[in-house]
C-alpha cells in the first residue's frame, strides 16, 4: 500500500503538443481516486505514465516514497485492469491469475491459496479451469480484477474497466469494485469518462480537460463548488445550467435583456455592464411558489421529459434555456407559461472567457 | 418496387467461370503429370515412355527398397530438412522480431529490403554467386579468412561443412518469405496482452515465451508446413552448387531421382518421386493435424 504523488507531470510526443500538461496531485494511501474527463483529455495517458507503460516527458511520479520515473513497469509493484481485459487467451483462468505470481517464483501452495481467495472473493471459483474464450464479458472482467488482486500490489490501476459491459452489469460491477476497495483498503486509481462512475466510486476526483487538471477534490465539493465552467458542465446529469448574463449595478440580466433577475438586496460593488456566466444546478431551479428571498422569473415550457422518479423540464427564458429537475407529480405541458425561482445561494458565477469561478 | 435492397447476388455458376482457366491449368500442368509419373513408376524403364508400357507392378519400388544409395539419400534428406526447417523458422522469427523492435529505428526499411530482395532474385543466380563465395582458391570468404590469418573454410568442398554451407545459401535465399509471414502475424498480436504481461512483471524473454509465441501459432503453422515441403524437395541448390557431392553428401532424394531419370531409369526415378510425394503429403498432414489441434482452446 502506498500513496501516489504526481508533481508537474507532462506528456508530449513532439515537444509542442501536450497530451498531459503539468498535472500535480497526490492520492493518499488507501484512497480511491478517479481521473475523469471526456475522450482525449489525457486521463488514460496519465494513468499509463503511472503504470510505466508511457514515458514521463516532464515532472516526477512517486509511489510511496520512491520516484519511479526511471523504473520499468514490472518493477513498480502496480497491477492494472485494462478496458479490454487483456487476458491471456491460451491460459486458463487459474493460470491467468497465477501468471504474475509464477514470474515472481511464489511457492505453488501460496499461489493456490491466493488465487483461491481471490476467486472466492470475486465468485469465479467454478471458472478456474476455463479459458477466457469460454467466459462472458462480466466474468472476464472479474478474472482481470482477480489477476490484479492476487499480486497484492501497492497500487491498483483501473483503465475504464466497465465500459465494455452492458448497463446493468456495469452498475453491479461498480458496486462490487467499491466493496472490494473497502475490503482491501489498497490505493486505487481509476480512469473513466463516466461522471456517474466517478461520483459513486471516488474518495477524490480529478477532472481533466485538454491535458490539464481542472479540479481535484472530493465528489461532494466538486459537485457543490465546481472550480470552473468545465467542471460545472461535466459533473452532474443533466449538467449545470450555464447562462450568459450581464451584471449591472441594479441587476443581473440574461436572455439578451428579455428577462431580468432582480436580486433583492443584492448591492452592486462592480462597475457597470460586466459580462459573466451564471450557473445553476437543475435541482435548484424551482417551479411553483417562490420563497421570499429567491430570484423569480417567467418562462415557457419547451420540453418535458418524465424519468419516473422525477421530471426534467426544459424552460425557454428569452433566447436561453434552463433545465429544471422537478417532482414527477408536477403536471406541466409543452407551451405552458410558468413562474420559476432560484435561490441566490445556488447561483455560481463564472468568467465568460476563462471559465474560472468568479 | 424493391427499395433499399442490395442487388441480387450473381448465380454461383459465374464464379466457376472465373476459376475455370486456372483450374484447367492446374489440372493439365499440375495434376496430370503427377498421375502420369505415378503411372510410370509401375512400368519397366525400358518401355516407360512408349505407348504400350510394360507393367511391372511394385518392381521399381522393390529396387528402391534394396538400393543403399536411396536409403542414404532419404536419410540425408530427412536430416537436412529437419535442420533446415528448424533454422529457417528460428532465423525468420528472430529477424521478424528485429524488424518489429524499436531500436532499429530508421534502419527498418533497409532491413526489410535486405531480407526480401533475395526472395525475388532468381534461384540459380543466387546459388552461382554463393558457389563463387565458397570457392576454395578465389572465393571471397576464404580470401577474407586468409587475409585475417584465420583457417580456411571448407565450404562446399568439404564433406563436413557442405550441408551447413548449402543450408546457409538456402536460408539466405528463402528466409525473407518466412519473415514476411511472421511479421504480418506479429503486427496482429494484441498489444494489450503485452502490456498486461509488463504489469505482471514479465521480462523480455518471459513476454516472448508466454505472450507472443502463443499468438504466433498461425504463422508457425504456415511457415513450418511450407518449409517442410520446400526443403524435402531441395533440388536447385544442389544442382547448381554441388551436384550431389562431395562424396554424395548432398545427394538428396529429388536430386538422386533426377540423376536416375537422366540415366533413363524412368521407372525407378518416378517411383522415387512418388515416395517423396507421399512423404511430403504425410508429414504436412501430420504437422497440420498436430498444430491445428494444439491451437484449440
Language-model-derived ranges and their functions:
Chain A
Residues 57-60, 210, 347:
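Conserved coupling/switch loops of ABC nucleotide-binding domains, chiefly the family-specific signature
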